[in-house]
From Swiss-Prot:
Tagged with keyword Transferase: yes
Compartments where located: Cytoplasm
Species assigned in the record: Methylorubrum extorquens (strain PA1)
PROSITE patterns, alphabetized: ADENYLATE_KINASE (PS00113)
The name this protein goes by in its record: Adenylate kinase
Assembly and interaction partners: Monomer.
Length: 200
């Protein structure tokens, strides 16, 4: 099972990722973690990334795709993986598609968590209020203002991926505003359907 998770910040991707990992025993691949691991392991791509990061540059799409390519060759990813946080742009998606095609690997689905942005901002504001009421510090990115900025960035940069993957026939939308356990049930039903198709 090879899937990509899409959805704006606050849509519950992290929670659902954890549950997918637990149920299907496939690793969640975070580009940040993979980048750090490649740098620490001093792989050829990792050394290239390290030099760029040390000079204050941004790691190119080609390097990130190279790191993903190395990571999915590892034993724990042989039966599948979840990509969360990558790709972020249509260009990255195209580069990822080309790399997977070279390896003869096909994605099973791109799962997009669809949310009501107004309700999402309300949810974040409520969480910030409850945190402050408990006398705990509110995380900077948990304030409605910062959250709206993150939502705007997502809409501009990552939302076009929805159209791109819809065009490939891989996109599956799930209502991310339902209670967490209901969303998990919807995700499970979807992914179990793919497993049955693959094994029949």
């Amino acid at each position: 099972m090879r899937i990509i998770l899409l959805g704006p910040p606050g849509a519950g991707k992290g929670t659902q990722s954890e549950r997918i990992v637990e149920r299907y025993r496939v690793p969640q691949l975070s580009t940040g973690d993979m980048l750090r691991a490649a740098v620490a392991a001093e792989t050829p791509v990792g050394l290239e990334a390290k030099a760029i990061m040390e000079s204050g540059g941004l790691v190119s799409d080609a390097i990130v795709v190279g790191i993903v390519a190395d990571r999915i060759e590892e034993a724990d990813a042989k039966n599948g993986f979840i990509l969360d946080g990558f790709p972020r742009t249509v260009e990255q998606a195209k580069a990822l598609d080309a790399m997977l095609a070279q390896k003869g690997i096909a994605l099973d689905a791109v799962v997009e968590f669809v949310v009501d942005e107004t309700a999402l901002v309300g949810r974040i504001a409520k969480r910030a209020e409850e945190t402050a009421a408990r006398g705990q510090p509110v995380r900077k990115d948990d304030t409605p203002e910062v959250f709206k900025t993150r939502l705007d960035a997502y809409r501009k940069q990552t939302a076009p991926l929805s159209d791109y993957y819809a065009g490939t026939g891989l996109l599956r939308k799930i209502d991310g505003m339902k209670p967490i356990d209901v969303v998990t049930g919807d995700v499970t039903a979807l992914l179990d359907g793919f497993r049955e198709t693959a094994s029949s």
